[in-house]
Amino acid sequence: MISLKQYYFDKFKWSLMALASSKKKKKNLLPENSMVGEEIVLEYEEAVGENLERIHEYIDITEKQLVLLRDLDAYISGKSGEKYAYLWLENSSLDDSEWQEIRRLAMAVILAFH
């Protein structure tokens, strides 16, 4: 049986890789007609928890990694509300500058783990 620590770490890795991937790769990760941005961000949010509490509880993380993760988390959190609904609900937005920044921030977190 998989431990909670392993479960959340695997979900964390998957969500970071999905956030960092190109529009084409993102769309291939989920069933056709999915709201890709929303689904990936929901997976990420489930992995890290509110205020990153799951990270602190289940994942061993350095201060540098945590700083980069906080940057990503703050950026995603800052794109909430009606004004940014298109980012999460419209697959055509996956190439927009906001998603390019999410990819860059997610890749920085990934690289910090290597």
Predicted segments, located by residue:
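Short terminal alpha-helical segments
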Residues: 1-49
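Amphipathic protein-protein interaction modules
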Residues: 49-104
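Amphipathic alpha-helical segments that form well-ordered structural scaffolds
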Residues: 105-109
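Aromatic-residue detector
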Residues: 36, 43-44, 85-89, 101, ...
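Short, flexible helix-adjacent loops and helix caps
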Residues: 24-28, 88, 114
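A structural signal for well-ordered alpha-helices, especially hydrophobic packing surfaces
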Residues: 16, 20, 73-76, 80, ...
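Generic intrinsically disordered, low-complexity segments enriched for polar/acidic and small residues
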Residues: 4-11, 41, 55, 72, ...
